[in-house]
C-alpha cells in the first residue's frame, strides 16, 4: 500500500483556498514521514496557476521522489459548493493540470442528476488521455449515501470513473462505512481518504448533510481513539 499526504493538512480548516505551508516544506515533511506521494489541491497549484508554476510544482515533487496521487483542480470542488460540478462542463484544463503533474487521477464533484451525463462525457475525454475521474464520499453530493453512490457509479458506467472511499463523511450522513460497505464499493474504489473526528452535537465543527441536517463533531488526530473505528477499515 502506498501512502499519500493530502495538501489539505496545510490549509486552514475554514478556508480551503489558503495554504499554511509552502509546497517545498510540505513535500519535505511527506518524505520525512515516509509518504510516497502528495495529493494535490488548488491551494498549492490548480487550474488558476500559471503553466510555469504547475511545472515547477511537479519538479519539486519529482526531485524528492514523490508522486502526485490525485489532483483536485479548483476551489469549488473541495468546498463542495454549487459551482463544484462546473469542472465537468469544461474538463480540459483539469486534464492538462493532471498531465503536467504526472497524475492519472482527478477528483470531481456531482450534486444533481444533470451532472451524470456531463460525468460520462468528461470520463470519455479523460480516457483519451489515460486519466481517471473519481468522486469522494461526501456530504451534500450524489455520493452522500452508499446506495445512491452505487446507483450513480452504475449510471455513469465508465471504467475510468470511480470512487474515493472516505469513512468520515459516510458516518456524518449516518451511513455504514465498515467491511460490508467496503466490499460493495470495492470494484469502484480508486482512492482512499482517511481523516478522524468524533461525533458531538455540541462539537466545535458542524457540517450540513442532506440526509441528517446539520451534524456536529470535533476534529481529532487520526491516531486518537473515540472517533472513526479505523481498525476494521
Predicted regions and their residues:
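Acidic-and-aromatic substrate-binding clefts and catalytic sites of carbohydrate-active enzymes
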Residues: 12-20, 41-53, 76-87, 110-117, ...
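Generic structural signal for well-ordered alpha-helices
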Residues: 23-30, 51-59, 91-95, 116-123, ...
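N-terminal pre-domain/capping segments
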Residues: 1-103, 127, 131, 158
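Acidic/histidine-rich catalytic cores of soluble enzymes
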Residues: 9-11, 37, 71, 121-227
Amino acid at each position: 500500500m502506498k501512502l499519500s499526504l493530502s495538501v489539505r493538512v496545510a490549509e486552514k480548516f475554514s478556508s480551503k483556498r489558503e495554504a499554511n505551508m509552502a509546497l517545498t516544506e510540505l513535500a519535505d515533511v511527506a518524505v520525512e514521514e515516509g509518504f510516497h506521494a502528495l495529493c494535490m489541491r488548488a491551494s498549492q497549484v490548480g487550474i488558476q496557476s500559471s503553466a510555469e508554476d504547475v511545472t515547477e510544482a511537479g519538479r519539486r515533487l519529482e526531485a524528492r521522489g514523490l508522486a502526485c496521487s490525485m489532483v483536485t483542480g479548483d476551489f469549488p470542488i473541495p468546498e463542495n459548493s454549487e459551482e463544484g460540478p462546473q469542472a465537468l462542463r469544461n474538463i480540459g484544463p483539469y486534464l492538462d493540470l493532471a498531465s503536467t503533474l504526472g497524475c492519472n487521477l482527478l477528483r470531481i464533484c456531482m450534486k444533481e442528476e444533470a451532472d451524470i451525463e456531463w460525468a460520462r462525457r468528461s470520463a470519455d475525454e479523460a480516457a483519451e488521455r489515460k486519466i481517471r475521474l473519481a468522486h469522494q464520499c461526501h456530504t451534500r453530493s450524489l455520493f452522500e449515501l452508499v446506495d445512491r453512490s452505487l446507483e450513480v457509479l452504475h449510471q455513469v458506467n465508465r471504467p475510468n470513473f470511480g470512487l474515493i472511499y472516505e469513512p468520515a463523511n459516510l458516518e456524518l450522513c449516518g451511513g455504514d462505512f465498515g467491511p460490508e460497505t467496503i466490499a460493495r464499493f470495492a470494484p469502484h474504489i480508486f482512492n482512499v481518504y482517511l481523516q478522524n473526528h468524533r461525533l458531538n452535537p455540541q462539537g466545535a465543527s458542524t457540517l450540513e448533510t442532506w440526509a441528517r441536517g446539520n451534524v456536529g463533531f470535533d476534529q481529532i488526530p487520526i491516531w486518537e481513539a473515540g472517533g472513526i473505528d479505523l481498525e476494521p477499515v
